[in-house]
């Protein structure tokens, strides 16, 4: 049997980046060495530092996300308040998820947190929070100093402040034709359909629901206009009321011809005796069934003839600089070719016909071909 050589097994030390013999005495001897211990301690410190940095980054990111959520929630609540929409009950303040860190907090940071808590309690005790009621009847709390709002009752809230009632944004109104529309007092928007967040009040219904009659005459419209003007003056004087009055907005002004037509109709109605209430009730729905176009009526556009006025463009004068094509064509110069006649042909004149001579070739080769020189 032939002899063969077998190598000893090797082991790679990840801390020292070197190869050692894979046996127990060699491994123990290497691990007891000073260089190996220093490398192990250095690796442990690096891992610890990386974990701390990662924890700090996660904490910073969580704080940034919480701040973004708080800002978005605040803007959303402000939009709801501006539009007069009820605040949903499932909205809660964003909470920062705690991040576990191996660094122990210093006593100075604890003192700062305690000071901040005391300041918040003092601000709450001073009466910065105000209790309000939404359109749905839910209570919320609003901070006049910081502008924050929350559903939970804050600490130190006294409860002796005035409650701020949410105002109804949409108001019901009547057009000149007797149709009901809805007007937004904040944005100025008007629509025919009843909005979802419309809040009916006792003072809103002023037309057909209370009196049972539509403003068919101009006198009723004028009285309603004066009534709305007096209400506007009362609001400006400071007599705030939670009930919003119905507004009557004129979409278009009537011409004098329509006013003249309405005049004799009013006189006829006054002169004629009152009919049975059943007949009047039958006539009212007919007037309401009048077809209305929310986009307005078609108008014919008349194109006005534009007056062609000569406008001075202050261009430079072009007199004598360029000629028109017609003038250039007329003034073209004609080229005259001269004819020359040959009187005599030399030898041919003496009665001898001309002879064409051939070229002489040197050594039987044409002259125009390149000849090889002596050097080549």
Swiss-Prot record:
SUPFAM superfamilies per UniProt: beta-beta-alpha zinc fingers (SSF57667), WW domain (SSF51045)
InterPro entries per the UniProt record, alphabetical: Matrin/U1-C_Znf_C2H2 (IPR000690), Matrin/U1-like-C_Znf_C2H2 (IPR003604), U1-CZ_Znf_C2H2 (IPR013085), WBP4 (IPR040023), WW_dom (IPR001202), WW_dom_sf (IPR036020), Znf_C2H2_sf (IPR036236)
Domain of life (superkingdom): Eukaryota
Composition bias, Basic residues: 114-123
Residues covered by the WW domain: 123-156, 164-197
Bias type Basic and acidic residues, positions: 219-272
Zinc finger (Matrin-type) residue numbers: 11-42
Localization, UniProt: Nucleus; Nucleus speckle
Region (Interaction with SNRNP200): 357-375
Keyword annotations of the record: Metal-binding, mRNA processing, mRNA splicing, Nucleus, Phosphoprotein, Repeat, Spliceosome, Zinc, Zinc-finger
TM spans (from-to): none
GO MF annotations in UniProt: nucleic acid binding; proline-rich region binding; zinc ion binding
PROSITE patterns: WW_DOMAIN_1 (PS01159), WW_DOMAIN_2 (PS50020), ZF_MATRIN (PS50171)
Subunit: Component of the spliceosome B complex. Associated with U2 snRNPs. Binds splicing factors SNRPB, SNRPC and SF1. Interacts via the WW domains with the Pro-rich domains of KHDRBS1/SAM68. Interacts via the WW domains with the Pro-rich domains of WBP11. Interacts with SNRNP200.
PANTHER family: WW DOMAIN BINDING PROTEIN 4, WW DOMAIN-BINDING PROTEIN 4
Protein's name according to its UniProt entry: WW domain-binding protein 4
Species in which this protein is naturally found: Mus musculus
Gene transcribed to yield this protein: Wbp4
């Amino acid at each position: 049997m032939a002899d063969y050589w077998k190598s000893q097994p090797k082991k790679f030390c990840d801390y020292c980046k070197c190869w050692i013999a894979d046996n127990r005495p060699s491994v123990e001897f290497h691990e007891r060495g000073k260089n190996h211990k220093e490398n192990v301690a250095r690796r442990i410190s690096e891992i610890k530092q990386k974990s701390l940095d990662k924890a700090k980054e996660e904490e910073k990111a969580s704080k940034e996300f919480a701040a973004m959520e708080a800002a978005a929630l605040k803007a959303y609540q402000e939009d709801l308040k501006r539009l007069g929409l009820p605040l949903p009950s499932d909205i809660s303040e964003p909470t920062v998820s705690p991040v576990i860190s191996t660094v122990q907090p210093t006593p100075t940071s604890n003192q700062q947190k305690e000071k901040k808590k005391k300041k918040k309690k003092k601000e709450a005790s001073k009466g910065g929070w105000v209790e309000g009621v939404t359109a749905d009847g839910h209570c919320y709390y609003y901070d006049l100093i910081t502008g924050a709002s929350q559903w939970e009752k804050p600490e130190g809230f006294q409860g002796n402040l005035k409650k701020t009632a949410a105002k109804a944004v949409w108001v019901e109104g009547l057009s000149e034709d007797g149709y009901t529309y809805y007007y937004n007092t904040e944005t100025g928007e008007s629509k025919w359909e009843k909005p979802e967040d419309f809040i009916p009040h006792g003072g809103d219904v002023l037309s057909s629901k209370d009196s049972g009659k539509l403003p068919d005459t101009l006198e009723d419209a004028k009285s309603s206009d004066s009534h709305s003007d007096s209400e506007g003056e009362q609001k400006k004087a400071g007599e705030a009321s939670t009930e919003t009055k119905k507004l009557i907005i004129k979409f278009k002004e009537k011409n004098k011809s329509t006013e003249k037509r309405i005049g004799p109709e009013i006189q006829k109605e006054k002169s004629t005796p009152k009919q049975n209430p059943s007949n009047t009730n039958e006539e009212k729905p007919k007037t309401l069934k009048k077809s209305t176009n929310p986009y307005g009526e078609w108008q014919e556009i008349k194109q006005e003839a534009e007056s062609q006025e000569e406008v001075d463009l202050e261009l430079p004068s072009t007199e004598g600089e360029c000629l028109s094509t017609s003038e250039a064509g007329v003034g073209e110069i004609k080229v005259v070719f001269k004819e020359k006649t040959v009187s005599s042909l030399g030898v041919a004149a003496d009665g001898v016909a001309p002879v064409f001579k051939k070229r002489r070739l040197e050594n039987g080769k044409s002259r125009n071909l390149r000849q090889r020189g002596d050097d080549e």
